[in-house]
């Protein structure tokens, strides 16, 4: 007897896929025979035991983790060498031997014991080695016999894996005093070769219980024990005696120990798991007890062998008569640390177990003798017992006799018995029509059979069903092939084999039978390799061996080339040469399943045909593109020939822009390949998921129908929520199947695939219970009614959509205020989230620039210093769909935050809960600050990533059920959305031209521009003869004019030419106007026409499609709920389409649609009409639609009238301005060969040229843009001294240059071209009712293309956010040049007006760039707003309209006392051309006027005034101040006193190096003093300078302004007096026309006081609180209640109406305006009689209504109300200019409404106005109420 300890080995397996995906680290290492387990948590303190590595020593340690580490790696051969060879030797020596593997699920036990075909494990190697050795050693002196048995222990029950009868019956375990524990009835089969063992083992494995768990896809769910008995017989030839040694090998493969949480076990899996764990726990306890015994701790300790079947059967192997080896298998991953530690501890304990092995020599003789003695003893006992009454004794006797019989069976008998069992098995299965394959038993060549295809890869093709001549298939017992499961009827199908050998399949009525994916309802012939589906999931493949061999022979006879051609047609079915039923890769379970689904979807593989059609389309596009390219090259060659002819040699440079680059083809190919690969990949993955979804839906529908749940499931498609996140990885799935659940009478629900999958488990259980229950039991019946996994009565929140805020703005020191689109899972914008993101501290830029220096700083210090603190504000969500707007909340995670931030809305309890609006708004007012360590990853995230904010809402009833579907509100909302969509593809761009001439100092200064009524180009440039000139061009985007991401980089070229001389045109009246006269302005409508044609085409196509679809639906008889929904949707879209068509044909003013009449008042120098330039880019990616290469230059074809390409001369650019898109080009006007340009322009002629520039754009596409501007120039000769002096003394025009505003349109808005709602598309793409329909392909393709748009939405929005940030940076850069920035009161919210609530949102003052509503801004564009609006500092490009009226106010103050006004001063009152006050003045960096009030005071002598004069100096000092300080007097003073006068001087700040137009406050102006200043003008003019600080010490400043007149209780200067009716305050100057008021004498004493701007309330704020000053509805009428004082000077005007003045009369208003009288009568706004005139030209102020009252009707901008005295009779017919597209840019002018002014000042103003009538715009008349 040899005592030996259990040999223990540990094996470490490689990482599996799950662990690799988790990126878990390796914690196990091997050093010789030691295993080191490192701690997972390295952050523990040094003294903590958990932080120390644990070391275990074993007999063998196998490192199988990484094959590349050759010196360490232990493969299967090394494991066998160390353990197997020793055990094999023990078996030959006659010892019992055992080897078992122990470890958690998936640790590699089965691999170590059984291995794979390529890498066999311990058991196959032991068996193979056993037979190799027996064959070697067998001779006449010794022989070997081998017997095997194979059993499994499953759920504590023992099953025989080699029993052919009923493999499911369980066997009993018994214990015998002699034999020990054994299994009663376990088959023991004799084997003669390794092949026999292999086949038996394979057969057993197939019967073994295997199932997938999370840890391991083919996890053993049972313990398997393979026993080999080796009988070694020794013959002594001499003596003739023989002896036997018997060795027993027990090879045990244990099931994995597991944790339910990790393996995801549930239901049966959990039950199995608990039993597996029970056996293994008992095994552990047995090992512990035996280890304790061996260590001598507790010799008598009880060993609980019988607590589990496993340990009972292993009793001999553990601590008994056996030599045992144990392999502990562990995972190296940190994720499995606890399990690994537990396994290593058990293995460590097992080392101490001592076994007592003895050699089993000649056991038979001894055992038989013992047994015989026992039998005799039992017989005696039985005889003594009465009449065999003891059943126990009888059992024991039978047991012993049976054992003796088994012992005495000869070897030959054993072999015969094994053969009989095999034959019996074959017969039994054949009787069932089944044959078990791969067991070494050959299938008959002549038999036809079916092979099963199974979802479980381990069970695939295990069953073979033989077909008889007439085979019945069904679920009844009488059928030949019995199938059970869903969809199988008792009699399902019949298969017949005809005499010719053909196989015919005949399905029964109403059965579900498919052949090769197609449904079958009539008899059909089957062929070799056909796939058959019966019911829901019984898939089979047919094998016809004869047919197959015949085909093979024909194949060999065929010509090789023919063979290749046909190979594809044979479907690779016949590559079956190795085995009749070998696994055919092409026809596995998944293939068969997919085939059925694809056929059901309408074609064998719709995706394939989609790709083919795409390919064809692509080829055609390529062909047509090449044809276009050829034509373009020819065109270009022709142009080159023309250009290079000798007389035109210097015409223009060729590098305007190139149409194509040589790499065009290559780039196109690369782009197409990438796009095709993405589409292909997406289609493939989507196809797989659709297949799965359709299978689940089919099953769910079947169960729901069976249980009468009235619920229907359909597959639809949606965009995965992860794909809406801009941070997602590229190439992720664009779309995924979702399940639409609909219950009769209830709304729709959308479930995810996972949800249906989980629900199906409940449905199946319910179905099974329903099948098994008694139908007549009322309790059961009510239970089935209540149990409802089929539909959710209460739905949780749904995802409305995801808003992506790109974080690039955190690199800059600006606040990003933006309305981010919320994109839903249909790929549509479902609203906007108003967000602010801002960096509070930390500098990302410096860290990047720091480079290596930063790296040198210690890490701790670095993390402390480099922190970025930013603020995220979520203000509100607007435009949300009504049916999802309940309990809306947001969720987002910022960078590495562990927990997501949940943002709840602010609840306003006062407002009603139900809103009638189709769209809702939710206020959050959430603000959060985040502090993040700046790392390389974080910087990358900032530059590439976005903050994805998910917006959720709770659904209310099905929106389609709402009666409000046809509400006008919904149609209006759609029209509003049309306006918004246009605003997303448009942006206005200003193009300014200045001509610079060299002055006496050699500097280039802008020439003067004078406006003229007959010149529509914005003004006439006054050039001097013989001067050196430059053309300065500037291009800039207009803020808040649309959200197209338009960014100009630089000006590439400047050209000038096309000189046209025109006679001076008389002012346009009805007599002189001819429609055919060409307009010499910069307007053209070529691009507009092109855009309209394209849009109309798109609408027409869409209309045809909608009509066709509606027709289909109308003609359909049985409409489903889906059809009714779709019909309603289509009708709604058809209605919206009509609105849209009207919008194209006749866009309403201010609608924001290109070509709509403009509603604006252009600044001086700007043209009235706005031409459109259509870039025609691809809506998807802003690439060109027509060209292979870069987009052609936008606007190249938009030529002006009279433009000739040959007449242009390219100018050399001599200066580019940094930070602005501005360039100067040198211009020699002599090259044009035009005498009027060289020697001077005659007085009666106008000279026009065209300036053309090419601008490089970076956004929306990298392309060029061609802009043209027509200019008018006047060249005058050299002036004499008198003229020069006069010129210097007279006023210089304030117009800096001429400009034109373009409306740039990138493309037709995407949704305008969209055909059908994506929801409907998705549903139709996933389900097509008619399989023959070609629509299925179209729907899927259409849907996928619409889904691809999401990526474009994100890309575009990223561009918009970039542009918003860059514009803020530019604005900031400009502002920083000024000392203090002025308050920007005029910033309007660009968010939808209809969504803005009545309450304010705190800081919600910024513009929301992305949701600009062009037509609904706060100030109506048809009117000039009240003077309250200060000037926005963004656009530093136009003179402020107001400053023109101040032009005279900086002249020598001494002259102000001269009572008589010289005629020379007429020119000092230029045209009052004011606009809304949006544009800032270029004067922001120039001398800013400061105004001082001089109050009359009798006690101060004139000498004080004279003393004050030297202080002021020649330059005039002007101080900005608010309105109240400008008000001179509230009422006419009773005692006549000298009126106050405003002294104005200029403060010149430090000169700036900036080329700009000279200030109208020029020092060169003459020294006269202005007698008239308008308050409105002052506020507008001085807006930008409100905060400009005066140089300290320039003048003494008094603490407050003195009262203006000696009134007893003077009001404070900052308050509006109560006794005066509210109204715009005006300042007027004394005049000489009123004889009752004296003009001031030159010697009047004045005291000069300084008024500080800080002491005055801002004019805007004062007006904001003054109800009379809010902008009127139309026109700037004086507010009601202004009373007679509002027009003080009108008291002198006669209100008598001449007899001829009646409605319909043709009249002249002022000097130039003509029109028809439409109204004569009183008005609400002012007493007296007023005349309403409809003008011929849009130079009016309104549409006939003022203050909300309609006096007459006309087009906006054509109406005017005046006093009767301003109207005189005209002669001739009425004419009206009508060019359709140029209707409307009303040249609105604001007049100075006089109120509360001293009468003497008013009269002087009136006099000046009359004196200036011939020169001034008549619109500046005081009596107009406009």
Curated annotation (Swiss-Prot):
How would you summarize where this protein is expressed among tissues? Ubiquitous.
PTM annotation (Phosphoserine): residues: 661, 1379, 1381-1382, 1391, 1410, 1432, 1438, 1537, 1559, 1644, 1797
Instruction: Please list the residue ranges annotated as the CAP-Gly domain.
Output: 1721-1763
Task: Note the InterPro entries from the entry.
Answer: CAP-Gly_dom_sf (IPR036859), CAP-Gly_domain (IPR000938), FHA_dom (IPR000253), Kinesin-like (IPR022164), Kinesin-like_KIF1-typ (IPR022140), Kinesin_assoc (IPR032405), Kinesin_motor_CS (IPR019821), Kinesin_motor_dom (IPR001752)
Alphabetical keyword list: ATP-binding, Cell projection, Coiled coil, Cytoplasm, Cytoskeleton, Microtubule, Motor protein, Nucleotide-binding, Phosphoprotein
Q: Where is this region: Disordered?
A: 546-582, 1367-1420, 1579-1650, 1662-1698
Tell me which GO cellular component terms the UniProt record holds. axon; cytoplasm; kinesin complex; microtubule
> What is the superkingdom listed in this entry's lineage?
Eukaryota
* Cellular compartments annotated: Cytoplasm, Cytoskeleton; Cell projection, Axon
Q: Where does ATP bind?
A: 103-110
Subunit arrangement?
Binds to DLG1 and DLG4. Interacts (when phosphorylated at Ser-1381 and Ser-1410) with 14-3-3.
What is the protein name stated in its UniProt record? Kinesin-like protein KIF13B
What is the organism of origin for this protein?
Answer: Homo sapiens (Human)
């Amino acid at each position: 007897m040899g005592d030996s300890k259990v040999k223990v080995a540990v094996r470490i397996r490689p990482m599996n896929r799950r662990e690799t995906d988790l990126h878990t680290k390796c914690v196990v290492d091997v050093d010789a025979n030691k295993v080191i387990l490192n701690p997972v948590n390295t952050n523990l303190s040094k003294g903590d035991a958990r932080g120390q590595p644990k070391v275990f020593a074993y007999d063998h340690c196998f490192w199988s983790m990484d094959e590349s580490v050759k010196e360490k790696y232990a493969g299967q051969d090394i494991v066998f060498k160390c353990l197997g060879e020793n055990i094999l030797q023990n078996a030959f020596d006659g010892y019992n031997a055992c080897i078992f593997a122990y470890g958690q699920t998936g640790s590699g036990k089965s691999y170590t014991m059984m291995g794979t075909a390529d890498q066999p494990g311990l058991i196959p190697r032991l068996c193979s080695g056993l037979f190799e050795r027996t064959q070697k050693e067998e001779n006449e002196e010794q022989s070997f016999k081998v017997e095997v048995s194979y059993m499994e222990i499953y759920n504590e029950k023992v099953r025989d894996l080699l029993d052919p009868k009923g493999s499911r019956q369980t066997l009993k375990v018994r214990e015998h005093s002699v034999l020990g524990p054994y299994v009663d009835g376990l088959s023991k089969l004799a084997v003669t070769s390794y092949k026999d063992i292999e086949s038996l083992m394979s057969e057993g494995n197939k019967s073994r219980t295997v199932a997938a768990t999370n840890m391991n896809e083919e996890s053993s769910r049972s313990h398997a024990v393979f026993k080999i008995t080796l009988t070694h017989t020794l013959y002594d030839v001499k003596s003739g005696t023989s002896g036997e040694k018997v060795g027993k090998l027990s090879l045990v493969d244990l099931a994995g120990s597991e944790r339910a949480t990790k393996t995801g076990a549930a239901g049966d899996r959990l039950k199995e798991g608990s039993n597996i764990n029970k056996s293994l726990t008992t095994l552990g306890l047995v090992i512990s007890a035996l280890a304790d015994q061996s260590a001598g701790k507790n010799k008598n300790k009880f060993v609980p062998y019988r607590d589990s079947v496993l340990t009972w059967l292993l009793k001999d192997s553990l601590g008994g008569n056996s030599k045992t080896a144990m392999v502990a298998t562990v995972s190296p991953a940190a994720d499995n640390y606890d399990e690994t530690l537990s396994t290593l501890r058990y293995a460590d304990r097992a080392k101490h177990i001592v076994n007592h092995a003895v050699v089993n020599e000649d056991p038979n003789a001894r055992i038989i003798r013992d047994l015989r003695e026992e039998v005799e003893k039992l017989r005696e006992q039985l005889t003594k017992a009465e009449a065999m009454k003891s059943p126990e004794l009888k059992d024991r006797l039978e047991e012993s006799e049976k054992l003796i019989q088994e012992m005495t069976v000869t070897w030959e008998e054993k072999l015969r018995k094994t053969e009989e069992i095999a034959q019996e098995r074959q017969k039994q299965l054949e009787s069932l029509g089944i044959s078990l394959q791969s067991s070494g038993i050959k299938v008959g060549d002549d038999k036809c059979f079916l092979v099963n295809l199974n979802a479980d890869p381990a069970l695939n093709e295990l069953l073979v069903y033989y077909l008889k001549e007439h085979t019945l298939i069904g679920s009844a017992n009488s059928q030949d092939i019995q199938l059970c499961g869903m969809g199988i009827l008792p009699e399902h199908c019949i298969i017949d084999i005809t005499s010719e050998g053909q196989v015919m399949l005949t399905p029964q009525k109403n059965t579900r039978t498919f052949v090769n994916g197609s449904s079958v309802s009539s008899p059909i012939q089957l062929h070799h390799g056909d796939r058959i589906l019966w019911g829901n999931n019984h898939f089979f493949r047919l094998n016809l061996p004869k047919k197959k061999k015949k085909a093979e022979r024909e194949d060999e006879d065929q010509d090789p080339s023919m063979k290749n051609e046909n190979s594809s047609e044979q479907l690779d079915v016949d590559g079956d040469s190795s085995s009749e039923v070998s696994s055919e890769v092409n026809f596995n379970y998944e293939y068969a399943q997919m085939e059925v689904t694809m056929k059901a979807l309408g074609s064998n593989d719709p995706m394939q045909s989609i790709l083919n059609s795409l390919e064809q389309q692509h080829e055609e596009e390529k062909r047509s593109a090449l044809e276009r390219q050829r034509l373009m090259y020819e065109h270009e060659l022709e142009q080159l020939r023309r250009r290079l002819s000798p007389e035109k040699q210097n015409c223009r440079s060729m590098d305007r822009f190139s149409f194509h680059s040589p790499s065009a083809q290559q780039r196109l190919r690369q782009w197409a390949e990438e796009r095709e690969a993405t589409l292909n990949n997406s289609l493939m993955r989507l196809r797989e998921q659709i297949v799965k979804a359709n299978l689940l839906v089919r099953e769910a529908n079947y169960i729901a129908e069976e249980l009468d749940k009235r619920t229907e499931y359909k597959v639809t498609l949606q965009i995965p929520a992860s794909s809406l996140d801009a941070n997602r990885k590229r190439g992720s799935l664009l779309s995924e199947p979702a399940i639409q659940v609909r219950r009769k009478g209830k709304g729709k629900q959308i479930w995810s695939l996972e949800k249906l999958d989980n629900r199906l488990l409940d449905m199946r259980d319910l179905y099974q219970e329903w099948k098994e229950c008694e139908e007549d039991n009322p309790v059961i019946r009510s239970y089935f009614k209540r149990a409802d996994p089929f539909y959710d009565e209460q739905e949780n929140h749904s995802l409305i959509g995801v808003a992506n805020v790109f974080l690039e703005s955190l690199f800059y020191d600006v606040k990003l205020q933006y309305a981010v689109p919320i994109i839903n899972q249909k790929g549509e914008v479902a609203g906007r989230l108003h967000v602010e993101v801002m960096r509070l501290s930390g500098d990302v830029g410096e860290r990047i620039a720091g480079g290596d220096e930063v790296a040198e700083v210690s890490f701790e210090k670095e993390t402390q210093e480099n922190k970025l603190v930013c603020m995220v504000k979520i203000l509100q969500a607007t435009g949300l769909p009504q049916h999802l707007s309940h309990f809306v909340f947001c969720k987002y995670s910022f960078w590495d935050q562990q927990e997501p931030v949940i943002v709840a809305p602010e609840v306003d309890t006062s407002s009603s809960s139900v809103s009638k609006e189709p769209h809702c708004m939710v206020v959050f007012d959430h603000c959060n600050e985040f502090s993040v360590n700046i790392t390389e990853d974080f910087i990358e995230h900032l530059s590439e990533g976005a903050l994805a904010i998910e917006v959720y809402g709770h659904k209310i009833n099905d929106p389609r059920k709402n009666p409000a579907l046809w509400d006008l509100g919904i149609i209006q909302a759609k029209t509003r959305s049309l306006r918004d969509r246009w605003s997303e593809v448009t942006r206005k761009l200003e193009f300014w031209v200045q001509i610079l001439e060299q002055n006496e100092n050699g500097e280039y200064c802008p020439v003067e521009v004078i406006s003229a009524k007959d010149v529509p180009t914005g003004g006439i440039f006054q050039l001097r003869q013989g001067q050196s000139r430059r053309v300065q061009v500037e291009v800039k985007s207009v803020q808040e004019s649309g959200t197209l991401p338009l960014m100009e980089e630089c000006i590439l070229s400047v050209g000038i030419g096309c000189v046209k001389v025109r006679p001076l045109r008389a002012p346009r009246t009805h007599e002189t106007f001819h429609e055919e006269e060409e307009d010499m302005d910069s307007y053209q409508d070529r691009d507009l026409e092109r855009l309209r044609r394209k849009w109309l085409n798109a609408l027409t196509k869409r209309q045809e499609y909608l009509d066709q679809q509606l027709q289909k639906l109308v003609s359909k008889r049985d409409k489903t709920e889906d059809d009714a929904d779709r019909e309603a949707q289509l009708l709604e879209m058809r209605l919206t389409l009509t609105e849209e068509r009207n919008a194209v044909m006749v866009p309403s003013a201010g609608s924001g649609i290109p070509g709509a009449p403009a509603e604006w008042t252009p600044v001086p120098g700007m043209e009235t009409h706005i031409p459109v330039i259509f870039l025609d880019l691809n809506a998807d990616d802003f690439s060109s639609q027509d060209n292979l290469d870069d987009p052609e230059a936008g606007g190249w074809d938009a030529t002006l009238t009279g433009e000739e390409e040959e007449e242009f001369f390219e100018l050399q650019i001599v200066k580019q301005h940094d930070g602005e898109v501005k360039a100067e080009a040198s211009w020699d006007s002599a090259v044009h060969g035009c005498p009027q340009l060289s020697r001077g322009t005659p007085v009666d002629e106008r000279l026009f040229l065209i300036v053309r520039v090419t601008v490089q754009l970076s956004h929306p596409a990298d392309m060029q843009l061609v802009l043209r501007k027509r200019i008018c120039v006047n060249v005058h000769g050299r002036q004499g001294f008198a003229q020069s002096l006069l010129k210097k003394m007279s006023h210089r025009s304030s117009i800096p240059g001429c400009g034109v505003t373009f409306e740039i349109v990138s493309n037709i808005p995407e949704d305008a071209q969209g055909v059908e709602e994506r929801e409907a598309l998705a549903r139709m793409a996933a389900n097509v009712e008619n399989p023959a329909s070609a629509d299925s392909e179209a729907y899927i393709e259409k849907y996928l293309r619409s889904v691809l748009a999401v990526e474009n939405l994100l890309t575009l929005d990223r561009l918009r956010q970039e542009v918003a940030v860059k514009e803020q940076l530019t604005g900031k850069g400009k502002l920083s040049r000024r000392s203090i920035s002025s308050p920007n009161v005029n910033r309007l919210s660009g968010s939808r007006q209809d969504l803005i609530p009545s309450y304010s949102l705190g800081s919600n003052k910024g513009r929301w760039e992305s949701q600009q509503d062009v037509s609904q801004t706060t100030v109506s564009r048809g009117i000039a707003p009240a003077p309250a609006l200060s000037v926005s500092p963004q656009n530093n490009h136009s003179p402020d309209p107001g400053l023109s009226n101040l032009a005279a106010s900086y002249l020598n103050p001494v002259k102000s006392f001269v009572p008589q006004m010289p005629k020379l001063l007429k020119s000092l009152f230029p045209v009052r051309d004011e606009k809304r006050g949006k544009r800032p003045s270029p004067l922001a960096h120039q001398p800013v006027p400061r105004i001082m009030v001089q109050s009359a005071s009798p006690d101060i002598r004139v000498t004080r005034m004279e003393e004050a004069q030297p202080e002021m100096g020649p330059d005039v000092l002007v101080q900005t101040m608010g309105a109240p300080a400008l008000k001179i007097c509230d009422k006419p003073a009773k005692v006549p006193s000298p009126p106050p006068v405003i002294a104005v001087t200029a403060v010149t700040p430090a000169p700036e190096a900036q080329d700009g137009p000279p200030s109208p406050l020029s020092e060169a102006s003459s020294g006269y003093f202005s007698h008239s200043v308008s308050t409105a003008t002052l506020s507008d003019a001085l807006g930008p300078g409100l905060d400009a600080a005066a140089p300290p010490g320039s003048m003494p400043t008094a603490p407050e302004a003195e009262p203006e007149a000696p009134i007893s209780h003077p009001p404070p200067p900052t308050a509006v007096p109560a006794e005066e009716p509210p109204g715009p305050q005006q300042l007027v100057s004394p005049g000489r026309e009123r004889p009752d008021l004296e003009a001031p004498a030159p010697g009047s004493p004045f005291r000069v006081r300084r008024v500080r701007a800080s002491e005055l309330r801002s004019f805007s704020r004062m007006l904001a609180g003054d109800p009379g000053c809010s902008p009127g509805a139309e026109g700037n009428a004086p507010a009601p209640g202004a009373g007679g004082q509002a027009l003080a000077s009108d008291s002198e005007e006669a209100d008598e109406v001449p007899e001829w003045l009646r409605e319909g009369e043709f009249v002249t208003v002022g000097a130039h305006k003509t029109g028809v009288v439409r109204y004569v009568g009183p008005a609400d706004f002012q007493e007296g009689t007023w005349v309403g005139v409809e003008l011929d030209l849009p130079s009016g102020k309104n549409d006939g209504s003022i203050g909300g009252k309609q006096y007459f009707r006309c087009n906006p901008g054509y109406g005017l109300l005046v006093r009767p005295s301003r109207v005189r009779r005209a002669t001739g017919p009425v004419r009206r200019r009508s060019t359709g597209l140029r209707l409307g840019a009303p040249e609105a002018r604001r007049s100075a409404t006089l109120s509360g002014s001293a009468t003497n000042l008013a009269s002087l103003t009136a006099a000046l106005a009359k004196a200036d009538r011939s020169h001034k715009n008549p619109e500046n008349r005081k009596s107009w109420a406009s």
